Swiss-Prot record:
Entry function: Crystallins are the dominant structural components of the vertebrate eye lens.
Region described as Connecting peptide: spans on this chain: 118-123
Protein name listed in UniProt: Beta-crystallin A3-2
Family classification: Belongs to the beta/gamma-crystallin family.
Organism of this sequence: Aquarana catesbeiana (American bullfrog)
Length: 215
């Protein structure tokens, strides 16, 4: 649906401006996201094909709605890719609760984002370990699991993980609820030895559901 011109201010991102905004070297790929400073795709909008470490440098005080047109992305609560993580797959997100999903935490901020370069839904493989540093009982995952306990994991914690292919999103609670942790095969060499490596917001080993990220 076309946004009325009186309500929309569109700005194209030049390569020079993106070089200032984006501190991460990201290879060219099929990624495109459009962000808006008002809910329901209203207000100022801006298109990106690469990462943005601080949306305030683009004249936004926050992102209140967005559309993912190509690829998969990670949104972050704070600037510089910090705080809670939100997986953003292809589709429309008219309000903050559309990307936070059934997260039990009320977080309306989304201040930085980047593409998930390794997402490959058809060829994804993850190995989870009972204890940190890849010790103890292990299990190889190649599918989506709304409940690790139901598939026989036996407890509500995961000590460490190795992403062998693709990208995954892990959730604190069953049914894809709670904090989100995005794990990628091209970050940390695909190895996450301790919960502290899952993200700056991670505080616990608790993971009870896991799924592949859709490209």
């Amino acid at each position: 649906m076309e946004i009325p011109a009186i309500q929309t201010e569109r700005e194209d991102i030049t390569s020079e401006k993106m070089a200032q905004i984006n501190p991460l070297p990201v290879p060219l790929g099929p990624w495109k996201i459009t962000v808006y400073d008002q809910e329901n795709f209203q207000g100022k909008r801006m298109e990106f094909t690469s990462s943005c470490a601080n949306i305030m440098e683009c004249g936004f005080d926050n992102i209140r709605s967005l559309k993912v047109e190509c690829g998969a992305w990670i949104g972050y609560e704070h600037t510089s890719f910090c705080g809670q993580q939100f997986v953003l797959e292809r589709g429309e997100y008219p309000r903050w609760d559309a990307w936070s999903g059934s997260n039990a935490y009320h977080i309306e901020r989304l201040m930085s984002f980047r593409p998930i370069c390794s997402a490959n839904h058809e060829e994804s493989k993850l190995v989870i370990f009972e204890k940190e540093n890849f010790i103890g009982r292990q299990r190889e995952l190649c599918d989506d699991y709304p409940s690790l306990q139901a598939m026989g994991w036996g407890n509500n914690e995961v000590g460490s993980m190795k992403v062998q292919c693709g990208a995954w999103v892990c959730y604190q609670y069953p049914g894809y609820r709670g904090y989100q942790y995005i794990l990628e095969s091209d970050h940390h060499g695909g190895e996450y030895k301790h919960w502290r490596e899952w993200g700056s917001h991670a505080q616990t080993f608790q993971i009870q559901s896991i799924r592949r990220i859709q490209q």
